[in-house]
Amino acid sequence: MPALTRALRCALLAARVALAREKARRAFASHGEMLSQPAAALARLPPASVRVLVGFGAALLVSLVVLHRRPAARGAAGGGGPAEYDPAARFLALSEGANATIAADLRALTAGPHLAGTGAAAGAAARVLSGFRAAGLRTLTREYTPLLSYPGHASLALLRADRTLLAHLSLDEPADVGRRLVRPYHAYAPSGGAVAEAVFVNLGREEDYLTLERLGVSVRGRVAVAIRGGGYRGGVVRRAAERSAAAVLIAGHADGGVERGTVILGGPGDPLTPGWAATAGAERLDFDHEDVKRRFPAIPSMPVSGKTASAIIRTLGGPALPADWQTGVGLPVDVGGVGPGPTLVNFTYQEDRKMGMIQDIFAIIKGYEEPDRYVILGNHRDAWTYGAVDPNSGTSALLDIARRLGIMLQSGWTPRRTIILCSWDAEEFGMIGSTEWVEENLEDLQSKAVAYLNVDCAVQGIGLFAGSTPQLDNLLVDVTRQVKDPDVEGKTVHDTWNKMTGGINIERLARTDSDFAPFLHHAGIPCMDLYYGKEFPGYHTALDSYHWMEKHGDPLFLRHVAIVEIWGLLALRLADDPVLPFDYQTYASQLQEHANAFSSMMENSKWVHLLNRSIEDLSDAGLEFLKEAKKLQDQNISDGYSLMRRRLLNDRLLLAERSFLQADGLQGRGWFKHLMYSPPEDYESKLSFFPGVADAISRSSNRSAKEQQAAVRHEVRKISRAIQRAADVLRGEFSNRNESLYSSLSVAP
């Protein structure tokens, strides 16, 4: 009876696969529309269905004859499914007609604005949920109630020195012709106002204020007018507040557009629930709590159009505009000086803060062998305006991945590990949706998450750009060799990527501008961020529309298809490879480059020697691991013992990144825990790695050389210990390093 049962199951599987293939073929014809239930398809009895029935009978007959044979093995490429099933090839084959499907999804998602926490956001959420369900995937939703920020009343005018009105200045966005969008504003900018002289501060960087000091110009009590390009806008506002400015106006470069954005400080997530999720009944800090007050800028700010900024700047007197500022202005102005005055700026702003409901949406594909290991793909769907680039180019790509995986599931494939597709909300306010979910599930994610693959602005121009933690570099390079370049016939993405940048260039993720931040900086999960095109002039403006994408960004939507293919193949490798495709020798090489760069900045070489010893050990551990994994792969892995050994190997790979976390976080910034790639406290820091060192340097800049050396040395020791922890985890053993070896390298205070 057991043999007969197996035979019947094999026959049923064969019939199910045949039905799924017929459904997939017809799905291509309708650009991805899923068919109805198999019973309804059989009721219509087209020729293909007759073939299915015949196939079922034949399979049943053969199975009864060969009862002694075992059922079909798992697919050769690693995922569960029919024998000889290649998930990567199948995924790529589903690109036929995908550009039309992606375009249709993007058009629907961008039909109107969908700012988080507003009624208009429901439409985009419904579209994503419907897409996940149409793919046949299990879905979940999770709601949070964070503090959100919206614009109230605002006004801007130019006054003569005697405070009589010279001109009302517009705070509207010229490109928002129908006034369908939320007016331009800075989220979390406090209410306030000023009647004061203006000073042009160029990009609003520290070096710009030093230039003004040399010219004898101060912004104390005045309105600082800046041009976008000086780093994070919140950092620009904070820098002006530190110089005692009364308010800040920031002009962008988009022709007719005004760039909205958040100015919240101190990292991502809901400011009232730092470290825990903003669920409906959660504890919330008071607004007068020190941890909350330092999250908000001290002075009001507002984005303005180039035309409005020009009207202010051209009235300025004072010292002449520095020559190197003239090329960076980027505005149609005839400027005589940097200010102050002689005219006055009358600026008022009223913020509307309130608790708002946001919703994260998930689709889950459970793994057959390691269901408790998660490969996570994420994109946010909320937008400041229409969001054709930011973020819904990525949303439409995520929906296409869901469609393809759904078809593959119906063909009998199942991933080895669980795949989770995530649609985040309220990213534009400071990565709130993703951060709250990570905080709520931190322990589970730290013990089970394999990697997080992020796509935000999937397409904003030509050429692939990527950032990742270093152990994923080689995986990304391998995958790009499998994907056709969308712009150059006969070339792969790898070919053009390599040529465009003069060699493969993968940046590190020491920034907090998208949803990888909580996964890497707080949870220590390997991350990657992908996008096509480097600069988009309509960023966060009314120009971020489907019309722009169709006319300029990706007219044929083939760059979208390329991103889908790269993103999806990365997920399949991480979900299906027997041994996780991580390379910690590459990680060690990158850390060595960081150590060398740090060495060029510091005089004391003993500190660098301390780092070098740990990095060398990590490299050795990575090589030892590769040899051990190769030996296991050459053996029979069908028995339970070998499967357990492989599981233990993968766990060491999975947990090594967590070793770079400092349990209590960076000094004074406890939410950020990653000692290699958290962002530095100073937004203008020249170090994009070793954030504790960067913080120690900036905080001790006014101290004695002895004190600065002590502060930096302490952070170097932390980093060295973390790297050593990672090496020990890769080896799967307790550390046996003699602490005296480190003590001998200490520097006398």
From Swiss-Prot:
Residues 278-574 are annotated as: Catalytic. It comes from the Eukaryota. Gene3D superfamilies: 3.50.30.30, Transferrin receptor-like, dimerisation domain, Zn peptidases. Zn(2+) 2 binds at D390, E428, H540. Zn(2+) 1 binds at H380, D390, D456. Expressed in developing embryos, roots, leaf blade, vegetative shoot apex, inflorescence apex and flowers. It is found in: Cell membrane. One of its GO terms (biological process) is proteolysis. The chain crosses the membrane at residues 47-67. InterPro entries: PA_dom_sf, Peptidase_M28, Peptidase_M28B, TFR-like_dimer_dom, TFR-like_dimer_dom_sf. Its cofactor is Zn(2+). It is a single-pass type II membrane protein. The active site is at E427. Binds 2 Zn(2+) ions per subunit. It catalyses: Release of an unsubstituted, C-terminal glutamyl residue, typically from Ac-Asp-Glu or folylpoly-gamma-glutamates. This is Probable glutamate carboxypeptidase PLA3. It comes from Oryza sativa subsp. japonica.
